Amino acid sequence: MKPSCYDNVGKAVKRKCETTIAQKRDISLMDTGANTYLIRPNYKDKFKAGVAKECIGEILREQLYGVQYDPEEVPTLSRSLADSIKHKLKDMAFDRYKFIVQVVIGEQRGEGVKMAARCFWDADTDNYAQEIYMNDSLFCVAAAFAVYYY
């Protein structure tokens, strides 16, 4: 198979290429938001686990008060809680942080539950907050992991 720069006879074909620029922009002067060279957050922008814990607890109390455990509703409720927590944390303006939210809901039957999480992260910038909610019917453990985006 011949390359596309040859015609059917085998002769080289010259191709003319023209480009036009419809809009000129100076990319170096564009406002891109956060500085790309920041590798550590300022103290005021750092993730505050205590504030996040209060936020998570408030959401759990509001949305789980009076709720009875129903295994059919738990998957939807878990996703709804995780989304609510994630959006509330994003609204708190922790700049350049990515959030991972995990919600576990189980039936309250007087049995013990052990949960653990392990992470490989930067101890100077990354952190987490968790909160536990319990009533007569269910327990809920919500954890939010905040990872600084370099």
From Swiss-Prot:
Q: Which CDD domains match?
A: DLC-like_TCTEX1D2
Q: Which UniProt keywords apply?
A: Cytoplasm
* Localization (cell): Dynein axonemal particle
Q: What is its main location?
A: other
Q: Which Gene3D superfamilies match?
A: Tctex-1 (3.30.1140.40)
Q: Where are the transmembrane segments?
A: none
Q: Does the keyword Phosphoprotein apply?
A: no
Its Gene Ontology cellular component terms are: cilium; cytoplasm; cytoplasmic dynein complex; dynein axonemal particle
The keyword Cytoplasm is assigned to this record: yes
GO MF, one term, reads: dynein intermediate chain binding
The entry's family comment says: Belongs to the dynein light chain Tctex-type family.
* Protein purpose: Acts as one of several non-catalytic accessory components of the cytoplasmic dynein 2 complex (dynein-2 complex), a motor protein complex that drives the movement of cargos along microtubules within cilia and flagella in concert with the intraflagellar transport (IFT) system. Required for proper retrograde ciliary transport.
Q: What is this protein called?
A: Dynein light chain Tctex-type protein 2B
From which organism does this entry originate? Danio rerio
